C-alpha cells in the first residue's frame, strides 16, 4: 500500500518533530548533492534547527557561493536603479515631444523666444516644401497613369475598328436597286391623261340599269309612258353616246402609246 498524504502543518509533539526534522534535513542535503552532481550546478544549503544548530552544504564552498550571491544582489539593485533612471529619461523625452507637437500645431508658443520662433518657422517652411514636392510627385504619377490608360483605350478602340472592318469585308453589301423587269416612267400630274373626276364620270356612264318594282301591268304602262317621254331626245342621247365613245377611243390609244408619242401629241 502507498503512503498516505501527510497534512502540512506544525507537528505539536516535540519528539516527533525532531525525528521528522532529522529525516527531512538528511533528504534535503542528499537532493542538493544529487542536483549539483547531475546538473553541474552550484548549490549551497544552509539550515538552522529550532535549537539554533547549523547544518550546511555547498558544492563549491560556502564563502564563494555567498560572495557570488552578494555580487548578484548588488548588480540586481544597480540594474533596477538604472532602469528607473532610464524610465525618467524617457518620460522627459516624451513630455518634450508632446510640447514640440503642440508648437508645430501653433499652440503653446508663449514660452518661446524670438530665435526659437524663427527656428520653428524654418522647420514649418521646410516641412511645407517637402509636402508640396510629395504632392507634385503624386499628381505627376497620377497624370502619367491616366495617359497610359488613355493610350491603352485608344489602342483597344483601334483594334475593335479593324475587327469591325474585317467583319464587314466578309459580309455581302446590301444595296437597294430596281429590278430590270420593272420599268417606271415619271409623268407630270398636270399632263396626266385621266384624272380622278374623269374616271368617276366614265365609271358612272358605263351602265344605265334601273330597277322598278310593281305589278306586271303597271310596269308595262310605265315603260310605255317613259318611252314616249324619251323619244323626242333620242337624237341627243345618240350624239352624246357617240362623242363619249370617240373620247374613250382617243384615251385608250393615248394610254397604250409610248411616252414619246404622248409628248408629241401634247406638243401638237
From Swiss-Prot:
InterPro entries per the record? MADS-box/MEF2_TF, MEF2-like_N, TF_Kbox, TF_MADSbox, TF_MADSbox_sf
Induction field:
By auxin (2,4-D). Feedback loop leading to direct down-regulation by itself.
Q: What happens when the gene is disrupted?
A: Early flowering under short-days conditions (SD) when combined with AGL18 disruption. Decreased ability to produce somatic embryos in vitro.
Which SMART domains does UniProt cross-reference here? MADS (SM00432)
Which Pfam families does the annotation name? Answer: K-box, SRF-TF
- MADS-box domain location: 1-61
| Compartments, record wording | Nucleus; Cytoplasm
Oligomeric state and interaction partners are given as: Homodimer. Interacts with SVP, AGL24, AP1, AGL6, AG, AGL1, AGL11, AGL5, AGL16, SOC1 and AGL21.
**Name of the molecule in the record:** Agamous-like MADS-box protein AGL15
User: Which species?
Assistant: Arabidopsis thaliana
Q: Gene name, please?
A: AGL15
Amino acid at each position: 500500500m502507498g503512503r498516505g498524504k501527510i497534512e502540512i502543518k506544525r507537528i505539536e509533539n516535540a519528539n516527533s518533530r525532531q525525528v521528522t526534522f532529522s529525516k527531512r534535513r538528511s533528504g534535503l542535503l542528499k537532493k542538493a548533492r544529487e542536483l549539483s552532481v547531475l546538473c553541474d550546478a552550484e548549490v549551497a544549503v544552509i539550515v538552522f534547527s529550532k535549537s539554533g544548530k547549523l547544518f550546511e552544504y555547498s558544492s563549491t564552498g560556502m564563502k564563494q557561493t555567498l560572495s557570488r550571491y552578494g555580487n548578484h544582489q548588488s548588480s540586481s539593485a544597480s540594474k533596477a536603479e538604472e532602469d528607473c533612471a532610464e524610465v525618467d529619461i524617457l518620460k522627459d523625452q516624451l513630455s518634450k515631444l508632446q510640447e514640440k507637437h503642440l508648437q508645430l500645431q501653433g499652440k503653446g508658443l508663449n514660452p518661446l523666444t524670438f530665435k526659437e520662433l524663427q527656428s520653428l518657422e524654418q522647420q514649418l517652411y521646410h516641412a511645407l516644401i517637402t509636402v508640396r514636392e510629395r504632392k507634385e510627385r503624386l499628381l505627376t504619377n497620377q497624370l502619367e497613369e491616366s495617359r497610359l490608360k488613355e493610350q491603352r483605350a485608344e489602342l483597344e478602340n483601334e483594334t475593335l475598328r479593324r475587327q469591325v472592318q474585317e467583319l464587314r469585308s466578309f459580309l455581302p453589301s446590301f444595296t437597294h436597286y430596281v429590278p430590270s423587269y420593272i420599268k417606271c416612267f415619271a409623268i407630270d400630274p398636270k399632263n396626266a391623261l385621266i384624272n380622278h373626276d374623269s374616271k368617276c364620270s366614265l365609271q358612272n356612264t358605263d351602265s344605265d340599269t334601273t330597277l322598278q318594282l310593281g305589278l306586271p301591268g303597271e310596269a308595262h304602262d310605265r315603260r310605255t309612258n317613259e318611252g314616249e317621254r324619251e323619244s323626242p331626245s333620242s337624237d341627243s342621247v345618240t350624239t352624246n353616246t357617240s362623242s363619249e365613245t370617240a373620247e374613250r377611243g382617243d384615251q385608250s390609244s393615248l394610254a397604250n402609246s409610248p411616252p414619246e408619242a404622248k409628248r408629241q401629241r401634247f406638243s401638237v
